[in-house]
Amino acid sequence: YIIMCVQTVFFIPAGRSNLWMQTTLSENMEDDMERVSLAKELSSTTYPGRGIVIGRTKDGKKAVTAYFIMGRSENSRNRVFVEDGEGIRTQAFDPSKLEDPSLIIYAPVRVLGNKTIVTNGDQTDTIYELMDKQQTFEQALRTREFEPDAPNYTPRISGIMHIDNGEFNYAMSILKSNNGNPVACNRYTFAYSAPVAGEGHFIHTYMGDGNPLPSFEGEPTWVDIEGDIDEFTDMVWENLNEDNKVSLFVRYIDIATGEYESRIVNKNK
């Protein structure tokens, strides 16, 4: 089962009262959330946008992450993933067709010691640089907001995997506009300690296609993690919409040793 703890703190403005009220709600989510097939979740919409999956293999030995990008415009579809050190970056498949590199050219994956950072934008660099200065994942993301691509205001989604001394944990974050209102940024972090074998979580930018595109809602989806790296990679790629999928990155990390293997799939070849 999953336990979710939500803490809300209300502060009264200075000068009126020094009172504050704190409420804590602990809720057992077992009856409210069911684990679903990742394949079915991926194939259920034509345009989830960009997505991050993090979890653990069925044998419990490997930490898993996947990151995919999709596109509707020629500029968005004109991309490939390429290796960049221990991570990856996006680059234009045909440089002559690149119109606007902002928001589409970035490093989705970087490695900082025993931490693997996966995001849908240049906040990868923000997390890397500020965590390297001893700030936390959440503190780093406090300096960022959703993307300025009105009217969509695409959420910034991020994940971090921590492997140390045979232990594995991860966290996911989403920064999004306040129900389409860019005046406010809503910030959510979901932390998962001691991940269970054969399970993971999936977060993506959009609930589906639309105009404007509807931002992701709720908690990251609780999903099955199945197969070896090639089987998992094939399953994800095959269940993304054929017209809109662009690139996929998958990494399996040995929790005992920290060694990893990766796969990259690009539609543009």
Predicted regions and their residues:
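Aromatic (phenylalanine/tyrosine) cluster motif
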Residues: 1, 10-11
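Generic detector of N-terminal low-structure segments
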Residues: 12-13, 28
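Conserved short alpha-helical segments that host acidic/polar catalytic motifs at enzyme active sites
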Residues: 30-269
